[in-house]
């Protein structure tokens, strides 16, 4: 449904998006995951035709979006990080306003309103000013405004950034409902736990995809054994072990340390020889299933 080929965008000497090529299938949630500055927002702006690339192409349903930008507008919706709601208009007025922008008649908007209120749970607040909504409710309203013209493809740029955990879960529940309706969703996020919810994920760093696939495929493709290490001094242990090239990808989570090793027994002996010099004991080391965050950190560190 979406085919991206050698997509590149430069700002001066900085290459924000570097020769990306990938495809997105109809009816899937495709996650673009990475830290701030990775190039996620630039990529979505390119895909939505807000920006034009220096090189490469994006094709939607075999139509080049840069040659025929208006041909794909009715099938596409893009929600930026800060969606332009009119805060002095009510929830209902915002939906009607964006519906008219998309060329819908008042009767068409009225027909679609019920469904928009159903999935967004905003019906009780339709007469409330948008400026008086919570952050999570504003995001739901922004999504409703994007969907008023019933697009086939939805591009979402960090839609849950700065939103409380409960609202994040509710937002993802809405996305799954849209997925069940056949909408193709491309979502960028800095939250790696959210990436676990996607059908497929591309991890982005410094304008490039460093790995991609289903969350499980990415985890299965990692080299080494993932372990959880508990010591008598986790903070000092992290500082000491990070100085060793084999353990640069170590992550301190609560009171435990998480990392990939080639061999548990050899790694235990090596770490013990380092830590015991500082009177730190290893209490346990156990094999665990890695998260996408564990994989991302290890890939970035090993590639550094």
Ranges and model annotations:
Residues 88, 129-133:
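Conserved ABC ATPase signature
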Residues 96, 100, 107-125:
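Conserved ABC ATPase "signature" region
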Residues 150:
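Conserved catalytic motifs of ABC-family nucleotide-binding domains
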Residues 212-213:
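ABC ATPase "signature
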Residues 56-67, 71-72:
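Conserved ABC transporter NBD signature motif
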Residues 154-157:
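Catalytic Walker B motif of ABC-type/P-loop ATPase nucleotide-binding domains
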């Amino acid at each position: 449904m979406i085919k991206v080929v050698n997509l590149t965008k430069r700002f001066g000497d900085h290459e924000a998006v570097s020769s990306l090529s990938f495809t997105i299938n109809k009816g899937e949630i495709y996650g673009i995951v990475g830290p701030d500055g990775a190039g996620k927002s630039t990529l979505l702006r390119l895909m939505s035709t807000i920006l034009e690339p220096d090189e490469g192409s994006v094709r939607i349903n075999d139509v080049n979006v840069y040659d025929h930008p208006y041909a794909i507008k009715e099938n596409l919706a893009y929600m930026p990080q800060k969606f332009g709601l009119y805060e002095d208009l009510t929830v209902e007025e915002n939906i009607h306003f964006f519906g008219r922008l998309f060329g819908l008649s008042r009767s068409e908007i009225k027909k679609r309103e019920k469904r928009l209120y159903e999935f967004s749970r905003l019906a009780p607040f339709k007469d409330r000013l948008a400026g008086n909504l919570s952050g999570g409710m504003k995001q739901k309203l922004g999504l409703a405004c994007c969907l008023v013209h019933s697009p086939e493809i939805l591009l979402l740029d960090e839609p849950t950034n700065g939103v409380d955990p409960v609202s994040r879960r509710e937002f993802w529940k809405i996305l799954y409902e849209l997925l069940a309706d056949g909408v193709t969703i491309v979502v960028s996020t800095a939250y790696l736990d959210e990436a676990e919810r996607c059908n497929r994920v591309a991890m982005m760093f410094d304008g490039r995809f460093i790995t991609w696939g289903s969350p499980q495929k990415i985890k299965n493709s990692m080299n080494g054994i993932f372990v959880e290490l508990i010591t008598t001094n986790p903070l000092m242990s992290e500082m000491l072990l990070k100085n060793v090239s084999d353990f640069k990808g170590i992550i301190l989570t609560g009171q435990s340390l998480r990392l990939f090793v080639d061999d548990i027994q050899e790694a235990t002996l090596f770490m013990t020889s380092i830590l015991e010099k500082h009177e730190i004991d290893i209490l346990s080391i156990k094999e665990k299933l890695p998260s996408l965050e564990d994989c991302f950190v290890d890939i970035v560190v090993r590639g550094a």
